[in-house]
Amino acid sequence: IVGTIGKRKIIDRLIAEKKIDVSSVRGKWESFLIQTVDNYLVVAGSDKRGTIYGVYDISEKIGVSPWYYWADVPIKKNNNIYVKSGKYIQDSPKVKYRGIFINDEHPSFASWGREKFGGVNSKLYVHIFELLLRLKANYLWPAMWANAFNEDDPMSPVLADEYGIVMGTSHHEPMMRAHKEYTKRRKEIGPWDYINNKENIDKFFREGLERNKHFDNIITIGTVSYTHLRAHE
């Protein structure tokens, strides 16, 4: 039985019937409880990612490595799987945001993505999202050398949100705008010069924030961008 506290009726019913005590995880960040109740194994997460981590914790313990896809780690096969009666509690992580940056990915990663998935798109990113969650991570700076996460495939940010992955942009991509988004509009926007081109750059930034306002993002704030140039070329 899997569910998030306050989001799934059967979990809330087990709490009301005092079959599970979630006081140690309720309201916490990315925490979960795994407990045997009668003949059931219950996973109750404090929030969305807590629930996901609980499921993947069991998956790893029964023989599925987080790296089964990316590193071809064989999945262990078992004739029987046994669960000891009792309760296991995973507290909130000490580091709130934990993730990776797919940096300087061209040509190797990008070429592989085109060959396997038709591009660095949502079909590829779902495998990255799953890896992050299996590793109990939650944060991603996407590929940006020649890619624009939000524009190349509009399903990519939608799936990130569905999977519970917090998205950001790299150290020289302010306000949720990818490097590639600027380069392909450079004639329209003008020079990366905040002193003399403030109005156009503000508009460019504002559009990025408006586009992503419904998603869980961490926003890079700064004016270094466009091949690491300062905001006055």
Region locations from a protein language model:
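Contiguous, structured surface segment used for ligand recognition
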Residues: 1-92
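Structural motif
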Residues: 2-7, 44-46, 103-104, 143-146, ...
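An acidic-aromatic substrate-binding cleft motif
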Residues: 70-117, 124, 130-143
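Structural preference for beta-strand elements that scaffold enzyme active sites
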Residues: 97-99, 139, 166-168, 218-220
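Aromatic- and acidic-residue-enriched carbohydrate-binding clefts of CAZyme catalytic domains
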Residues: 106, 115-117, 131, 161-163, ...
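Well-ordered, non-membrane alpha-helical segments in soluble/globular domains
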Residues: 121-125, 151-154, 195-207, 230
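Aromatic-lined substrate-binding rim segments of carbohydrate-active enzymes
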Residues: 147-171
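Conserved small/polar residues in nucleotide/adenosyl-binding loops
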Residues: 227-233
